């Protein structure tokens, strides 16, 4: 969410009515989330000035670990320097830390492509936004899910109940520090996740959803007391429920 919102912001800055705008002090502290959207807290360090040049050799974009040769345009300005400066800063301050951990394994290759392409500045902001929107579409639609045997048949479902909340085993990237709370496309995907985790014996899906509209599933290692909840469904492994009273 943070990376996509940042890319949308940089897309606007690249195509603003004032011209391409560079953020000169590009640090995480300069941004804040407001209603799910990333905002710049201080525009005093923004500039529409693009480096003047006479030839391509005048247009090197330097960073501490990398340098990028750019073209000198016919009007004597380094072509796209503000856009590329913003994009590489987004790569080094945000993408490298957030993208490797922010999607299911099947989507990781798409995020790796974005990471590599922005790190080498092979993508401009237009291509970067398009790539992010493709990943978001795959994520929200569930099209990334690989065809696999139906696993939900191995679970008993109890509608209108949930288990008592409490601390349980942890997983990454969890929405809760108390246990394993992940977003899923469906109960079938949740069953696949539960099967892949040796501690998991059951999971609960409620109507709580993430910013993408995906439901949250809470994975648990033991069967605890059930309490009524009209908006929840408990799924318990048949192997875990055998011999236990439900």
Residue positions per predicted region:
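C-terminal/domain-terminus segments
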Residues: 102-123, 211-227
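C-terminal, well-structured subdomains that either form a transmembrane helix-short loop-helix hairpin
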Residues: 28-30, 113, 120, 124, ...
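Catalytic-loop of the protein kinase fold
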Residues: 10-42
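Extracellular disulfide-rich cysteine clusters
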Residues: 132-139, 143-246
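Eukaryotic basic, amphipathic alpha-helical target segments in cytosolic regions
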Residues: 10-18, 86, 98-103, 136-143, ...
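Short amphipathic alpha-helical segments embedded in low-complexity Lys/Glu-rich regions
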Residues: 22-31, 105-115, 128-133, 145-150, ...
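C-lobe/activation-segment region of protein kinase-like
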Residues: 21, 34-119, 127, 131
